[in-house]
UniProtKB/Swiss-Prot annotation:
Catalytic activity: 1-(2-carboxyphenylamino)-1-deoxy-D-ribulose 5-phosphate + H(+) = (1S,2R)-1-C-(indol-3-yl)glycerol 3-phosphate + CO2 + H2O
GO molecular function: indole-3-glycerol-phosphate synthase activity; phosphoribosylanthranilate isomerase activity
Domain of life: Bacteria
Organism: Streptococcus sanguinis (strain SK36)
Annotated gene: trpC
Keywords: Amino-acid biosynthesis, Aromatic amino acid biosynthesis, Decarboxylase, Lyase, Tryptophan biosynthesis
EC number: 4.1.1.48
Protein's UniProt name: Indole-3-glycerol phosphate synthase
């Protein structure tokens, strides 16, 4: 993986946004609040299950997957939310995947993309997302705050992704309620689950936290379970021979 991954993908996003038209706002899909759900179900490590056909680090993961059936399995097996990759070039996703999945499930859906503009947020909402991703490393704090306020003003929830203490403090400052800790470094693309463990010492009681990336096994989930409300898992589920069994393995009872 090139060490220029993040700048490369952001440059591509700037080109996409420049060519993107403004969409008329459509009604917000009705479902429960992810924040409230995670807050109210602390006895079990919750799962945000991802639909991801490919990634820059692994290449093709599961190109032949029936995305709607995969999402239905996630919901049936107790996922708290479904994350849907919509980036076409780097992850072989599509906005239509978000639209199709959101129309077939009742739980929250996350638009997993590199969002840098309000136009993308409106498109996500119109496609059925109730949660969007904002990545601290991809935005200035001023722009992050603007996009966060814009999204929440439209009734969306926001998963604010961090990777180090400075980014975590930024997420706290802008008022983020749902905060992700990505165990993957978006510059080197290497993963280290210790990132989650180290940052957990700085968590606040009134927020909810999600550990993202590098969660493949029950042992991985057990490591982060004492500190996090949920884990976001993509590759392990997309590669699993038995998705239901893998979900059962990852949903840790926290007593």
């Amino acid at each position: 993986m090139s060490k220029e991954f993040l700048p490369t993908i952001l440059k591509q996003k700037e080109q996409e946004v420049a060519a993107m038209s403004y969409e008329e706002l459509q009604p917000l899909r009705s479902t429960y609040s992810l924040y409230e759900y995670l807050k109210n179900h602390p006895q079990e490590l919750q799962l945000i299950a991802e639909v991801k056909k490919a990634s820059p680090s692994l290449g093709d993961i599961n190109l032949g997957v029936d995305i709607v059936e995969q999402a239905r399995t996630y919901e049936r097996c107790g996922a708290a939310m479904i994350s849907v990759l919509t980036d076409e070039i780097f992850f072989k996703g599509h906005l239509d995947y978000l639209r199709e999945i959101s129309s077939q499930v009742t739980i929250p859906t996350l638009n997993k993309d590199f969002i840098i503009d309000e136009k993308q947020i409106v498109r996500a909402r119109n496609a059925g997302a109730t949660v969007i991703l904002l990545i601290v490393a991809a935005l200035s704090e001023k722009r992050l705050q603007e996009l966060y306020d814009f999204a929440t003003g439209l009734g969306l929830e926001v998963l604010v992704e961090t990777h180090n203490l400075a980014e975590l403090e930024t997420a706290h400052r802008i008022g983020a309620q749902i905060i992700g800790v990505n165990n993957r470094n978006l510059v080197t693309f290497e993963t280290d689950i210790n990132t989650s463990l180290q940052l957990s010492a700085h968590f606040k009681d009134d927020r909810v936290y999600v550990s993202e990336s590098a969660i493949f096994s029950k042992e991985d989930a057990e490591l982060v379970a004492p500190y996090f409300h949920a884990v976001l898992v993509g590759t392990a589920l997309m590669q699993a021979e038995n998705v239901a069994e893998k979900i059962k393995e990852l949903k840790i009872d926290k007593g």
